[in-house]
């Protein structure tokens, strides 16, 4: 952040982009942030602050999967014409610190299927980072048919597999300490792949990341 600001980049934390702005030719000319200090009845309060208009020669939309503004731009310019419908998944991720004896820097593991049933798309990842840190996660396609399926519970079941839990379990007899979970999170991802990828440039801007659908789900 400091390097970016040193180069003249302005960062507005806490201000979400709420509206796409267009010029007289219909090209994107920027975005407007949402109004602040609006009551639950929709009326301005004493702390009301009007949103800002941010203009640019080129606006890059990077909101993540099915971004609020990105989907509007896709519809306005017909960017997904002739493409397969986009599909989505939910990815759940945890960051662990594990015993050095179980740490293998640079190791990357991927799996598909288990513990999901044959009708449900999904898979896992496990990456060994620096400083005895491990990132482990599980993705479940959001088109699953079983209404009782819990992606979180499936992730926890995945970690019970002998080849996975070995990294996190302790072994007192060998002086190996159990791992410690440091943080966790979840987010939606695009999973449609190349055939669902819309045109990503349009007058005045571009889509990147999951706003476009760049994730390689394979």
Give short role names for the model-derived ranges.
Residues 166-195:
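Flavin (FAD/FMN) cofactor-binding core of flavoprotein oxidoreductases
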Residues 184-215:
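FAD-binding beta-loop-beta segment adjacent to the flavin cofactor pocket
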Residues 3-173, 213-214:
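Predominantly flavin-linked oxidoreductase catalytic cores and closely associated redox partners
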Residues 218:
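An active-site-proximal "capping" alpha-helix that borders the catalytic cofactor pocket
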């Amino acid at each position: 952040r400091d390097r970016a600001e040193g180069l003249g980049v302005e960062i507005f934390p806490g201000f979400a982009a709420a509206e796409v702005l267009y010029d007289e030719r219909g090209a994107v000319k920027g975005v407007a942030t949402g109004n602040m200090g609006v009551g639950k009845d929709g009326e301005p309060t004493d702390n009301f602050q009007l949103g800002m208009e941010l203009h640019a020669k080129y606006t890059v939309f990077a909101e993540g999967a099915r971004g609020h503004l990105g989907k509007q731009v896709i519809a306005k310019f017909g960017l997904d014409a002739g493409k397969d419908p986009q599909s989505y998944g939910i990815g759940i991720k945890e960051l662990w610190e594990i015993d050095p004896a179980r740490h293998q820097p640079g190791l990357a593991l991927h799996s598909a299927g288990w513990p999901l049933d044959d009708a449900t798309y999904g898979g896992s990842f496990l990456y060994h980072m620096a400083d005895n840190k491990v990132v482990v996660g599980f993705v479940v396609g959001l088109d699953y048919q079983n209404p009782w399926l819990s992606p979180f519970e499936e992730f926890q079941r995945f970690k019970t597999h002998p080849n996975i839990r070995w990294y996190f379990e302790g072994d007192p007899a060998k002086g190996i300490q159990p791992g410690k979970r440091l943080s966790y999170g979840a987010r939606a991802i695009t999973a449609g792949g190349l055939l669902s990828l819309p045109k990503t440039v349009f007058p005045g801007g571009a889509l990147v990341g999951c706003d476009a659908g760049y994730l390689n789900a394979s």
